[in-house]
């Protein structure tokens, strides 16, 4: 399943209606239990009867995440899952994803410009610049290999090196 801040949810439905629609598309038998579980985990209980179009971007993000997880996928594709979120909500989403990944044993494919997020959520990384892979490895390997403090510094070093070659 896929989540992106660039894909909008149906605006005129309530949160519960949105999740129910997606649950029915996946033919989930225990849809109410699944909605209850995800709304509790993602702090959506108080929003279930709210109109989706009236939610904040952080609330919509959590609804989109619940939608993507409604059918308990084995693989979750995330495109900038915390883009435009305030630090507190972004941290909550990252913590949720870490816990959910371990609990449900799912794989997450993540596209992100947030290197702290990548470090926190990813075991294996492909760093790309202009659509070209510039390095790969796990966060610790990449940091040690390039003698930097963090992945952002690694990326900047590699990116500048690539620019000098062009």
Sequence positions of predicted segments:
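Conserved catalytic motifs of ABC-family nucleotide-binding domains
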Residues: 72
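Conserved ABC ATPase signature
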Residues: 51-55
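Conserved ABC ATPase "signature" region
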Residues: 1, 20, 24-47
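Catalytic Walker B motif of ABC-type/P-loop ATPase nucleotide-binding domains
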Residues: 76-79
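ABC ATPase "signature
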Residues: 136-137
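Helical segment within the ABC ATPase nucleotide-binding domain
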Residues: 91-103
């Amino acid at each position: 399943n896929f989540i992106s801040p660039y894909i909008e949810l149906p605006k005129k439905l309530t949160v519960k209606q949105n999740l129910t629609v997606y649950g029915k598309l996946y033919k989930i038998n225990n849809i109410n239990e699944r909605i209850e579980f995800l709304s509790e985990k993602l702090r959506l209980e108080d929003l279930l009867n709210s109109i989706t179009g009236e939610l904040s971007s952080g609330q919509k993000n959590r609804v989109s995440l619940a939608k993507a997880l409604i059918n308990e996928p084995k693989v979750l594709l995330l495109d900038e899952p915390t883009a435009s979120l305030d630090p507190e909500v972004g941290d909550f989403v990252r913590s949720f994803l870490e816990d959910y990944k371990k609990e449900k044993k799912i794989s997450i494919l993540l596209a992100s410009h947030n290197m702290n997020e990548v470090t926190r959520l990813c075991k294996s990384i492909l760093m790309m610049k202009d659509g070209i892979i510039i390095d790969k490895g796990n966060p610790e390997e990449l940091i040690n290999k390039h003698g930097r403090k963090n992945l952002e510094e690694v990326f900047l070093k590699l990116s500048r090196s690539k620019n000098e070659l062009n």
